[in-house]
Amino acid sequence: AIHELGHAVVGMVCKHHSKMTKVVINLSAPRSPAYTIFENPPNNFLTRENLFEHLMVLLSGRIAEETFYDISVTTGAINDFEEALKLAEKMVCYYGMGKNVIYPSLSDKYKEIIDLEVSTLIHEAYQQAEFVIHNFKELIVEGSEILKQEKVLTSETLMEVINNKYRHLYENMSNIKFCK
């Protein structure tokens, strides 16, 4: 539940990311015992901000685990990491959304630059998501308790909790530009 609330809360704070619709927990499902559903993007033209914030959301489940569990992280975030790496590589290599314009080449120098750009992008997204998670620790705990009890947590329910207890923090956080 904590892992999924990490995704949900970071997704709700990010103004360029598709909005979260619900979080579901179903421990009897063998492949995916919990998942967070987001709306589809409104169009096919995604900006660097959209994709950067998606990186943040992908990494936030793992960050929530690290923050709340007194153990090392689990293997539950492997799919999120694979997807984050693929997305960061696409952002740099195909979409030209890295810090530098990279021209295709087979040289080792070119590969080094790509690795550095991808690593930097993931590191920056990780730091930004970690900032959000640490600021919303109480909300994540509260939301995970609702999810464990109800098995489904809708965006409306989470927003109700935010409005009742965390409105000022949410409004301040929603004004931050995460993608630099």
Describe the predicted segments one by one:
Residues 1-180:
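Soluble catalytic regions of large protease machineries
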